């Protein structure tokens, strides 16, 4: 095939492409390599541990899909599962909203504020 179609999954915070970046910075379609772009709009504050958890979850989801055809549907399912995983990291406090982001829209829910039970009203 001269011009293979690029398969991709795009959610608010996760982009997965069936392809790889070449030396010129172009995305080249591939049936063998997946490229993951996490939080492309920098909506969250990340630390290395949280990023590694996402990469491990991605690897786990891809491994669970091994043997299945590489289709838009299967790629979207992995992307959707990763999006839910990011929500769980946010709810656990392992990542937080980036209040300096270009747009603050709280797409995964309004931040929760801890209330100190010892405070007197």
Swiss-Prot record:
It is a peripheral membrane protein. Its EC number is 7.1.1.-. GO terms for cellular component: plasma membrane-derived thylakoid membrane. It comes from the Bacteria. Its main location: membrane. Keywords: Membrane, NAD, NADP, Plastoquinone, Quinone, Thylakoid, Translocase, Transport. It catalyses: a plastoquinone + NADH + (n+1) H(+)(in) = a plastoquinol + NAD(+) + n H(+)(out); a plastoquinone + NADPH + (n+1) H(+)(in) = a plastoquinol + NADP(+) + n H(+)(out). The keyword Magnesium does not apply. It is found in: Cellular thylakoid membrane. Pfam families: NdhM (PF10664). One of its GO terms (molecular function) is oxidoreductase activity, acting on NAD(P)H, quinone or similar compound as acceptor. Belongs to the complex I NdhM subunit family. NDH-1 can be composed of about 15 different subunits; different subcomplexes with different compositions have been identified which probably have different functions. NDH-1 shuttles electrons from an unknown electron donor, via FMN and iron-sulfur (Fe-S) centers, to quinones in the respiratory and/or the photosynthetic chain. The immediate electron acceptor for the enzyme in this species is believed to be plastoquinone. Couples the redox reaction to proton translocation, and thus conserves the redox energy in a proton gradient. Cyanobacterial NDH-1 also plays a role in inorganic carbon-concentration. This is NAD(P)H-quinone oxidoreductase subunit M. It comes from Nostoc punctiforme (strain ATCC 29133 / PCC 73102). The lineage of its organism: Bacteria, Bacillati, Cyanobacteriota, Cyanophyceae, Nostocales. The gene is ndhM.
């Amino acid at each position: 095939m001269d011009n293979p179609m690029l398969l991709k999954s795009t959610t608010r915070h996760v982009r997965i492409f069936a392809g790889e970046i070449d030396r010129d910075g172009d995305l080249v379609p591939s049936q063998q390599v997946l490229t993951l772009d996490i939080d492309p709009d920098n909506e969250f504050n990340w630390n290395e541990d949280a990023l590694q958890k996402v990469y491990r979850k991605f690897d786990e989801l891809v491994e669970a899909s091994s043997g299945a055809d590489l289709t838009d549907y299967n790629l979207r399912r992995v992307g959707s599962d990763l999006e839910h995983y990011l929500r769980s990291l946010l709810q656990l406090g392992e990542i937080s909203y980036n209040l300096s982001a270009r747009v603050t829209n709280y797409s995964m829910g309004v931040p929760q504020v801890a209330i100190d039970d010892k405070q007197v009203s």
